[in-house]
Amino acid sequence: MVVASEIAKVASKTARDIAGCFTCQCGTQFDNVERIVQHFKECRYRDETCKDDDIVVYEPSSFVQDEKKDKPIIVEAASEATSEEACNSSKERQLPALSALSALSTLTTSANDDLWTARLIWQSTNDTKLDNSPSSNYTDLNHKLANYGLSILSIHALMCVECECLLNVIHTAQHMQIVHKLELNEDLLWFQELRTLKLKSPTNVLQTHSSQTHVYPYIRGLPVLLNGYECVPCTKNGTGFVHAIMDTFRHHVRRTHGKVIKLENCIRRTALQTVKNKYAQRCQFFKVDYVPLNGGEEEEEEEGEEKEDAQNIKERMVDFCFSKFMEKNQQRREQQDKGENKKRQDDVDQATDNNTNTILEDDEKDNDEEEEEEIVNAREKNLLNQQFNWTAIVKKLGENWDQLVRFEYTNGIVTLDTIVNQLIRYYYRGFRHLSGMTMGMRRMFTQGGSYSAQERGLCRLEQKDTVVRYAQSAALYLIFLLRRPSADSGIRRHLEAMCGATVERKEGGSNSSSNISNVANFDSAEDDNDNDNDNDRDSNNNNNNNNTNTDDDDKLAYLELHEALKLAFLQQYDFSKNVQDLEIMEFLACMSLHKDGTSKYAYEISACFAPLIYTCRLVAACELQRLIDEKQIDLLSIPSFQTAGSIAYAHVFCFITLGQRNLYDVLYETQKVVRDIIRTEGYANTLQGLSPSTVLFQPRSNSMYPCIGDAFNNMVRLDLSELTALYEGMFAKVQDLLKELCFDMNVEKLLPISLLRSIGDDINNSKLGYSFFKESIEIRSSHSVLLRTILKNSELCHRFFPSMSKKDLTKLFGGVSDQQRNECDNYSNHYNDNSNDNDNDVFLKLHWSKSAIKKYETKASIFNELLFCLVYISAGQPARAQEMVYWTLRNGKYKTRELYLMFGRLMIYSRYDKTRNMKFAEKPIPRFLSEPLSILALRYYVLVRPLEALMKYVTTADRSKVAVYLDFMFVIAGERLQRDLPYRIFPKATYQCIQKPLGFRNYRHIAHYFKEKNIEEEMTRESYFDLQAGHTRNTALYIYGRTMDNLHYLPSDYFANFFRASYKWQELLQIRDNPTHGLLVETKHPFIKRVDQLEEALNEKLARLVGEQMVEGDKEKDKTNEEKNKDEVKAEMTQPVVNQDSHDLQDQLATTPTAPTAFHYRPGLLQPSQTSVQHCCWALSQYYGLEAKFRSLKQFQSVYFSLLNRMNLITVLPTGGGKSLSFLIPALIEKKRQTPGKVMNMVTLVLVPMMSLRQDMMLRVNEKGLLVCSGNWTAFKDVRLTLETQLPDLFILTYESALTNSGLRFFESLATLGRLARVVIDEAHLLLTSGAWRTALSRASRLSGLYAPLHLLSATFPRQLEMVARQTFCTNFYVLRETSTARENIFYFLHPYDNTEFLLDLRTLMKRTKVFEGDGRAIIFCRTKKDVEYIHRRLHQSDLFAHTHVTIYTGDVSDEERQMNFDAFRNANGKTRIMIATKAFGLGINYMGVRLVVHYGLPASSMDYVQETGRAGRDGKYAIAALFYEKYDSTWSSYVEDSMKNFLNDNTMCVRSFLASEMDGECVCCASFANCVYCSRCSDSLLGEESTVSTMYGVKPTLPETPKPAIATHSRYNASFSSSPPPQPGNSSGMSAMNTNTTSTTPVSLSELSEITLFPSSVSPTWKKSFGNANTNLKYGLEDMSLSHRRGHKRTYDEHLNNVQQGVNHDMNRVHGSVGGMSGIVGIGIGIGDGDGDGDVDSRTIHFAEYKSRVQAVKKQWVDSTDISAQLERFFRVYKDECLSCTLGNPDTEIRAHTGKACPVRLSTCYKCGKADHNLRECKLRIRFQGLCLFCGLTKFEHADSDMAYTSDCRSWARKANLISLVYYAWNNVQYRRTIADKFLQGDVRD
C-alpha cells in the first residue's frame, strides 16, 4: 500500500464535497494540496518502497471529463507485476504522483478553495477490543489515558474515543491540543514518552485489516469515515442510501426525490464504513451502527434474573451516591455560610482592600456598565461647572487637591481599613435600631424630601455589597476631613480612640470576626420558621459569653465612632456663609473632577450622594435611639420631635430638615441640581418608529456582524414579526440542545408540563438554601436520571468511561452496596470520618473522559447563552444586564433567590439596587416566562444542571467549584455569567437567527417602543410594563429613565398585574402554546364576533327598531328607503373592519367607494319640537331649580342637538359655560322616557383626560342623585349584555381606560345592541394635541365606528383643530362656538417676575380679590413639580402667610393624597385657601370660589393659559388672573410656543385680543365688550385699583352681586355688531344675564310642569316672538344665518374640505340655529327636505346613513396603507394570461397572450437593461432594490403568511407575475423612466 496514492485517492474523491480539513495517517492536518505534497516529501511514514514513478494517475483532462460525468477519480498504485512495456505504452497518460497532486491543486483551487478540502478520520470498530486484561502491559496506562479520552486497543493501536479515530502516537499531543483544545502543560512530557511505545499507525492497521472481497454488508475492523451522509426519506421508506461525497448525494436527492424536498431536510450526518471493491476499483460505503466494546475478554452470559438484579443494584447505588453527592454540596455550602466566621471576616477585609483602590471605577461601572458606548456629554459638564464652580473650589485647596480623596491613609493607629470595618459594624447596629422603630418614626427621617409622599421611611440596606460600598464612601469623607487642616480636632480624637479600642481588642486575642458576625447576623435570612439558625444563635450566645471582656471595647469603639460621625455629618451652617466654603462641597468638588481639572460625568457625581445622605440619616437615627436609651426623651413626645426647642429637634431633627442650611440640606439641594442636569439619554437618535410594528434602529458598528437587508443611513429595519421569528428560532435551537444534553431521552414523560402547576413554592420562605426544587419528589428523584442513563447505555458509557467495561462498573457499584450494608450493620461507624469523603467518593473512582466532559460543557454553555436571550426577550419588558447576571436559583446567606414558581410559570423576581436614589431599598420586579419556556428551563435545571455539577467535581475534585451550578441561573464555561458577556452574546444570537445584529441596548429600547404602540394598559398612573422596565409611566412618555418598587406592603394583586403584563407581551410576540389555564388573563378575543352571533343580535335590534314607536318626528316614513338603508348597514356590520390574512377582503375594501353615498343632514329652517324643548327645560329645573335658564343659545343648541342623536358636534363654550349639560340633560330625559319592563336605559360614554376631572364630575353627578354613573367599565365586561341588562346611565372614564382594545370591544357591543346613546369627549383639545395621550389618539378613530354620535367638548378649541378632528375621527362635525373665549369678569394681569417682591405681590392680589374672606380661594400654577415644591417651601417659611394653609396638587402624588388635598381646598369652611398645582389641576375642575389664579412662569401654549385662567370666577364674580413671567421664557424657552412669546414681547397687545385671535379667530379687545374688567394692557393700573378702573372706564372691579346660580347667569355679546347695551333681565327679546334666584332645587315631575312657566326668556314657546326677524337678531348680537343652509342644499364631505382649504368662510357650517331668509322664521331643528313639524325625516334612517359613511371612512384608513399593493395585485390577476412587456413596450398594440419568457420584445436580451450585447453578469445597470424579497420584489408586510417570503420558494403573486423583471423593463422605457425617477429617485434618470 502506498501512502501517496492513498492521499491522492482521498483528495480526488473528496476534493469537491467533504468540508473540513485533510488529515494524514500520521495525524497532521492540511487545508490545501500544496501542503500535502510538501508533507509527502518529508513524512517519516512514507513507504520506502514507494517511488514517485510508481504512482499512476489520470491526466487533468481526464479528471475534468470524469468530473462532469460525476465519477470519482481513481488513483491506484501500479501493480508489481506491471511489465515495463505496459508502463512504456502508457507513459503519455502517466504522471508522477507529485505532478498529479499539483495538477489537482491547480484545478480544484481555481474552482473553489473551500469545496475540495476534506477530513478523513480512521476509526476502529467494535471488534477492536480494549486491551484492559490484567496481564496486559497497557492496563495502568489505559487508566491514565482514559482521562484524556484515549485508549490503546488490542490491535496495538491508539484510538481517540471522542473523535472515534485512530491516531499516530507521535502526533497524539498535537491532536489533543489542536482538535480538543486541551492544555497539557506538565503532561506534555508524558505524551512525548508515549512515542517509545511500539504502536501501529493508521496505515498499518489499514493494511492489516482491509478486505479484498466483492461485497461486504459489514466488516469488523475496517476504517470508518465519520463525516458521511444519510438520506432521511430513503431511510424512512426502508430502502436507505448513504454516501460520503456531497455531489453524489445531491444528485441522488434530485434524481429520487425531485425538487419538492429541500436538501437540508434530507441530509443527516452518519458514520460510514469504507470497503475497497476489487472489481469496481472504488470504495463502497456502508452505515455503521456503532456499539462500543465492553471489556477486554468476552464476558460469560449471566442468567436473566441475576443480570436484572445486578442492574437494579447498580441503578440504586448510582441514585444513592448521587444523592449523597448533592447533600455534601449542600452541607458544605451551609457550613461555609454559617459556621466559618473567620472566612466571612476575611471576605469583608478582602472586599475592603479590593474596593478601596477602585471605588470610583466600580461606581462608574455600577451606574452605567449596561451602556454599550458612552458619548461625551459636554453640555452636561458645562452645566455642572456653571452651577457649582467646581474648578474655583478645588483651586482654593491647592495643587494637590486630588490627594485629599486618596484611599490610602495611615496616620498613627488611624487607618482606612479600620474605619471601614467599624463603619460596617456601625451600619448593622443602626439596622437593629431601625427594626425597633415604628413606621411613623422612620418616616420622620424622610419628611420634606422629593419622594417623601411615597417613602415608607428610613430602611435597612438589603445587600452586603451595598453596606460595604456605603461604608467606604462615609469613611472616605472622614479621611478627607482628617486631611484638612481646618477640620474639627474632635473627629481625629474620637477616631483615634475608636482605633485604639479596636487594637486593644485584637491584642487581647478575641475574635473580632465573631462580633461582626453577631452584629451582621441580623442581615441573614429573615422569618426563619424552620429554626435553621438556632445553632448559630446558640453559638453566638456562647461567643458572647466567652467574649464578655471585649463587650466594653466594642461598645467603646461604637460610641467613639458615633461621636466622630456626629461631628462630621450632624452639622449646621450659618446662612451667611458661602456654600462653596463648606467642607462637604469641597469634598464633592474633589470627587467630581478628574486630575486634569475637567468635570466627570453627571452620573458619576450623582453616585456620591446616596451614601452620604443615607449615612447622615442613619447617624441621626442612632442619636435618637441613644437619647431614648438614656431616657432623655420618651416615645410619648413624638409629636414634639420636630418642634423647635425640643430635645429631639435640637439633637436630631434640626440636622436633617430641609431649608436649615445643614449638611443634609446642602447634600439634598446639590443632588437635586445634579438630577435636574442629568437626563437619561433618549433613543430618538438610535431608534426611529415607522409604524406600530416597524422600527429603524442603529446597531453598534461591528465588522463581525455586517448589516444584511433593510438598511437606511446606517439604520436597520426591524419588524415586530421578526421578533417572533427570533424567539421561535432561538427556542427551536434550545429544544434541540436540550435533547442532545439529555441524550435523546423522553423528558416529556419524565417531567410533564403539568409539573409546573403541581409543584408548590413557599415564596415567603427565606431559609438558607431553600428553593422550590426541594418541594417535589419528582424533581429530587430526577437529579440522577442522566447519570443512570449514561451507565445504562453502552455507547454513552463508552464515550464517558472509555477504559471501563460494564463488568468494572457493576463491580464498583456493587462494592458500594456492600459497604452500605456493612455500615448499616455497624451504625456507630457511619460516616464519622469526613476526612475520607474524597477517597471514598465513588464518582472519583470512575475513569472519566475529559474530552467528553469538555464537549458536554460546551453544549451546556451554548444552551445557557440561548436561554439567557430567550428570557431577556420573552419575560416582559427587558431587564438590565447587571440584574440578570446575578439571578440565583436558591436562597443565599445575604441574598434571596430570583427563581420562583407562580401561576404555573417560572417567575423571575429580581432585585436591583442601582436606583436607590432617595429610597435606599431594593426594588423587586416580577417577570413571568411563557409556559413552553418555563417547562424547558425547569427540565434543564432538574436534569442537566446536577450532571454538570458532578462533571465539574470529577474534573477538579473541588466542591467549591460545584456551587456555581447549583446557585446561579446562567452558567457559561463553568462560571457565572460575567457582566460583559450579555453585550456579546445577544448580538451574536440575534445575528445567527435573523441576520440582524440586534444589540442588548437596542432591544431594550425597541421593546419599550412596541409596548407603547401595541399594548394598552387599563390604568392611569402606573403601568406594570413600565415597572418591569424599571421606570415610571411619566418617564416612559417623555424620557427613558429608571425607577422601581419594593416587595414590602404590596397589594394582593401585585403579582397578578405583573403576570398580566408579561402575558400581554408574550401575546404580542405570538408565542405559541402559551395558555393561561383560566388564570387572570382572558384569551384574546377576535375583533368581530362570529357572523351568526352578530346576525342574531342585528335581527333582534332591527326588530325592536321596526316595532318601536317614534317619540318625536314625522309619522310618515319612507319604509322602502329605510329598509334599504338598514340592509346596507347590516351587511356592513357583519363584515370585519380589516383582515390582513384575506386577499379577497382586501379587494373588497379597496373597491369600496370612499366618498359617503348617503346624504348628510344639516340644520334646517324648521321650528324645534316643543315637546323636546319642554323636556329640556324640565331637566334643567331638576338640576338647578325652577327659575334656572340656559345661559346662551349655543348652550341650548348643544343640549338640543345632543338629545336628537342625529349629528356629531363640537361644542366650544367658555370655562364655566355649562358644557356638561350637553350630555347630562339628554341622559336624564332618556332615562325618564324609557318604558318600564321593556327596554332598559341608554348609556352615555364620557371620556375625560385626568383622574381629578373624572372624580370631580362623578362627585357632582352623584350629589344630584338623578343619574347613575360609573368610573369602571371592567366590572361589566364578564356580564352578558342584553336589552334588559341593567347598566349605569353614564360611564365616566379616562382616555387610557376607555381607548383600549378590550374597552372598545365592550362599547362596540353596547352600540350593536342600540344602547349607546352618545360618545362625549371632554377637553377634546388635549386628546388631539397633547403627546401624553398619543397612544389613545391612535385608537380614537375607532370611536367613529360606534353606532352613536360623537360630541367633542372644550373651552379652548382653536379653529385649526376642527380639521384635525375631522381627519382623526373620519367624520364631519358641526361646530357650536361662543363668540369669545376670554371672560368678562376676569382681570388679566401681566407682570415680570421679581423674586424679592413676588410674595408681597401675591398677598396684595389676594387682598384685592378677598381670598382671605368667605370661601375665597387662590390657585398658583407652576410648570414643574420642582417649582411647586419651591413655592410651597417659600410660602411655608414666610411670615406673610403664617396663618394660611397651603396644599399642593401634582401628578406624582398618590390618588388618596390628591383627593384629600382637593377636598380640603374646596371645603368652604376649611382653612386651606391656596392650592399650588401643575397643569393637571387646570382641566375641568369646577369650584366657584376661586378668586385668584396665579401663573408662576409662562404657560406652554395659549390653550393651557385659557384652561388654567378659566378656573377663576366661575360664579361670574370679579376675579384676577395674574401671570408672572421671566424674560428668558418669553425669548429663549424651548417649551413655550412662539405665539405666547410674541404675545409677551408685544406690550401693546390686549389679552382678550390675543385669546380671541388664537381661540376664536376673531379680532376683539376689552373695549369691544359692553361690560368687562379691562386687562392690565388696556388699564393703567398695575394691580387693578378700584378707583382707577372705575374712574377711567366706568366699570366696577366687582360685578353686581348675584345669587349663586346653578349653572351660570351671564352672557357675552360681540360688540362688533352693535354698541347698544345688552337687554335687561325680564326682557324676553334677548338672552341676557338673568338673576335666577334659585328658590328650590327639588325635582319636579312632568305633571307639575303645567302649573309652572317652563320656558326661559331665551327660548320661548313662540319662536317668532322670541327672536323676531333678522333685524332684531342683528340688534341684539345674533349672527345673520340666512345664508347657512337652505332646503335641499347638500354638499359632500370632500366639497366641504375643499371650501375650507380655499378659505371660504365656513362659519355657516358651524352654526346650527338659523334664520329663515324669506319667512323670517327661526329654526333650530334639523331638516333635510320638505315638511314641517317634529322631525320631518326619520331620525333612524339618517343615523344609519351617517353610521355607514363613518364605517366606510374607517375602513378606508385601514386600506390606504396597502392600497398600492392591492391595486397591483388586482391588476396582475386580471391580466395574468397576457404579456405585460408588450404593453409597456408599445401600449397601442394589442396584448398578445404569451408568457413573459417567450415575449419577442425581451427575447435574448439582458434581464436588467434589456440590451442584447451582454448577459446579466456583465450588466452595468446599478439600480438595486433594498429591503425587498429578491425573488418577487415585495416587502415583508406585503407577503401573506403562506408565501414563504425571502426564500427561493417564494410563492407570492408578484413572483408569478414576474414583477421585478417588469419593473426593470419599465425603467428602460423612456415613457416610464421619468415618472419613476421623479417619484422615487429625486429626478435622477441615470443608470
From Swiss-Prot:
Its EC number is 5.6.2.4. Coiled coil: none annotated. The gene is tlh1. GO terms for cellular component: chromosome; chromosome, telomeric repeat region; cytoplasm; nucleus. This is ATP-dependent DNA helicase tlh1. One of its GO terms (biological process) is DNA repair. Residues 1200-1375 form the Helicase ATP-binding domain. A probable ATP-dependent 3'-5' DNA helicase. Has a role in telomerase-independent telomere maintenance. A motif (DEAH box) lies at residues 1322-1325. Transmembrane segments: none annotated. Residues 360-372, 524-533 have a biased composition (Acidic residues). It catalyses: Couples ATP hydrolysis with the unwinding of duplex DNA by translocating in the 3'-5' direction; ATP + H2O = ADP + phosphate + H(+). It comes from the Eukaryota. Residues 329-372, 504-552, 1110-1135, 1613-1643 are annotated as: Disordered. GO terms for molecular function: 3'-5' DNA helicase activity; ATP binding; ATP hydrolysis activity; DNA binding; zinc ion binding. SMART domains: DEXDc, HELICc. Residues 1401-1559 form the Helicase C-terminal domain. ATP binds at residues 1213-1220, 1240-1247. Residues 329-347, 1112-1131 have a biased composition (Basic and acidic residues). Residues 540-549, 1626-1642 have a biased composition (Low complexity). Keywords: ATP-binding, DNA-binding, Helicase, Hydrolase, Isomerase, Metal-binding, Nucleotide-binding, Zinc, Zinc-finger. Belongs to the helicase family. RecQ subfamily.
